[in-house]
């Protein structure tokens, strides 16, 4: 009778206990299982915005398919902020299977440097997406090696999580010892680098908006497909999307320009007072600069002069826009561009498309084509002088003088 009792007692003790597996499996999904062992109830969906303020992507005009040097970085993205959680399980059914990366990015049919290029919303503009430094809370690490994984390159992309924190293993994952019990570790933290490529189809309009094209409502996702029998029934997705709502495209440009010089007041160059004799004998030129600032990827600079009023006899002069008995007559203003490494001293003829003042920016900006979020632009002064001249043979009559003009600066 004593032997039978021990046998029955052994069975009773055995039937009340679950076996902790030698393996730890991982699944992902929403945050419904945080603090209750239930695991995710459905998928998690989140959208990360690049910036909350205006930003510009600046590209050169392409001559062939190739990289632009423009990259956008998202660092320490945490799916936990959008309710996407990584869970562990150590039941007897646990299988240490991988996490699969899937994507809904739109393949362009083009490749460069061994990587697939994916479409954006702008024709001729493509991108690659690199995921790197993937981890979770409690120093839960992955086997992803540097530089990371280019999402979408091969059809099957997987990586493995592993627990390095002994407390997480013994006080967390090991308590999830049945197929329907899960310990919530935290969000999947990772870095994303988007690099842009262009070809000759790229011809953006001014301030054109761009988005990364997708065939669904996400760009990439995480899911465990083989965490173990019955464990897999609780496995869901984490879907990740990006918006570039505050990002605009532009070709090389300077975002700010101001008029500077000792005779400058706001947007006005004050010429001073002159006698008719001084004007006839040659008035002193008044120097001024157009200071181009926050210049991104600028090299060549071309300036043209446009006005609504030129001289009566000498059309190279800016004419007086004032009329009436108090207006000066017989004079105009000559605008000259000072000598540069690209251009000798020259007269900038108003309304003449062939009269172009040329300068060149030698300094490199530090923005990598993303402004103002990544680094600083350069500054470049354009040097000019304005001289009051007699308008042909028209008699000079004293009075007030005002000329207006627009300097059209482009970056070919």
From Swiss-Prot:
What subcellular locations does the record give?
Fimbrium
The reply to whether Nucleotidyltransferase figures as a keyword in the UniProt entry is: no
Gene Ontology biological process terms from the UniProt entry = cell adhesion; cell adhesion involved in single-species biofilm formation; DNA damage response; response to antibiotic
One Gene Ontology cellular component annotation held by this UniProt entry: pilus
Q: What induces it?
A: Repressed by H-NS.
Report the superkingdom from the record: Bacteria
Signal sequence, start to end = 1-22
Task: Fetch the InterPro entries from UniProt.
Answer: Adhesion_dom_fimbrial, Adhesion_dom_fimbrial_sf, Adhesion_dom_sf, Bact_Fimbrial_Adh_Pro, Fimbrial-like_YadC
Traits of the deletion mutant: Deletion of the operon under classical laboratory conditions does not result in any major effect on E.coli capacity to form biofilms compared with the wild-type strain.
Residue ranges that the Swiss-Prot or TrEMBL entry lists as coiled coil: none
Provide the alphabetized UniProt keywords.
Answer: Fimbrium, Signal
Task: Give the protein family.
Answer: Belongs to the fimbrial protein family.
Role summary: Part of the yadCKLM-htrE-yadVN fimbrial operon. Could contribute to adhesion to various surfaces in specific environmental niches.
Which NCBIfam families does the protein's record reference? PRK09723.1-1 (NF007267), PRK09723.1-2 (NF007268)
Q: What else is known?
A: The operon is cryptic under classical laboratory conditions, but is functional when constitutively expressed.
Name recorded for this polypeptide: Uncharacterized fimbrial-like protein YadC
Organismal lineage:
Bacteria, Pseudomonadati, Pseudomonadota, Gammaproteobacteria, Enterobacterales
Gene for this chain: yadC
């Amino acid at each position: 009778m004593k032997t039978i009792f021990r046998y029955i007692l052994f069975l009773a003790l055995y039937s009340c206990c679950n076996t902790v597996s030698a393996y730890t499996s991982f699944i992902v999904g929403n945050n419904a299982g945080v603090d209750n062992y239930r695991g995710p109830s459905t998928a998690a969906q989140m959208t990360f915005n690049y910036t909350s303020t205006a930003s510009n992507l600046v590209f050169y005009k392409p001559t062939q398919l190739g990289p632009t040097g423009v990259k956008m970085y998202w660092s320490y993205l945490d799916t936990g902020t959008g309710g996407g959680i990584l869970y562990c399980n150590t039941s007897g059914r646990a299988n240490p299977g991988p996490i699969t990366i899937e994507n809904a990015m739109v393949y362009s049919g083009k490749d460069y440097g061994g990587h697939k290029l994916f479409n954006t919303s702008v024709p001729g503009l493509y991108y690659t997406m690199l995921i790197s430094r993937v981890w979770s809370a409690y120093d839960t690490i992955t086997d992803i090696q540097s530089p990371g994984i280019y999402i979408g390159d091969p059809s099957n992309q997987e990586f493995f999580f592993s627990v390095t924190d002994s407390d997480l293993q013994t006080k967390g994952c090991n308590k999830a010892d049945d197929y329907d019990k899960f310990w919530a570790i935290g969000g999947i933290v990772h870095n994303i680098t988007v690099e842009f490529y262009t070809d000759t189809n790229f011809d953006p309009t001014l301030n054109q908006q761009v988005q990364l094209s997708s065939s669904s409502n996400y760009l990439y996702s995480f899911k465990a497909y083989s965490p173990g029998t019955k464990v897999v029934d609780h496995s869901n997705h984490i879907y990740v999307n990006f918006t570039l709502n505050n990002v605009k495209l532009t070709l090389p440009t300077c975002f700010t320009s101001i008029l500077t010089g000792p005779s400058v007041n706001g947007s006005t160059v004050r010429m001073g007072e002159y006698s008719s004799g001084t004007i006839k004998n040659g008035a002193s030129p008044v120097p001024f600069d157009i200071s181009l600032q926050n210049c991104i990827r600028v090299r060549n600079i071309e300036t043209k002069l446009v006005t609504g009023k030129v001289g009566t006899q000498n059309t190279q002069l800016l004419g007086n826009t004032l009329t009436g008995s108090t207006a000066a007559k017989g004079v105009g203003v000559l605008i000259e561009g000072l000598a540069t490494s690209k251009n000798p001293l020259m007269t900038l003829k108003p309304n003449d498309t062939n009269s172009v003042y040329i300068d060149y920016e030698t300094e490199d900006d530090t923005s990598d084509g993303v402004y103002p979020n990544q680094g600083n632009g350069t500054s470049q002064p354009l040097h000019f002088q304005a001289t009051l001249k007699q308008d042909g043979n028209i008699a000079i009559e004293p009075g007030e003088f005002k000329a207006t003009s627009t300097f059209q600066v482009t970056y070919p």
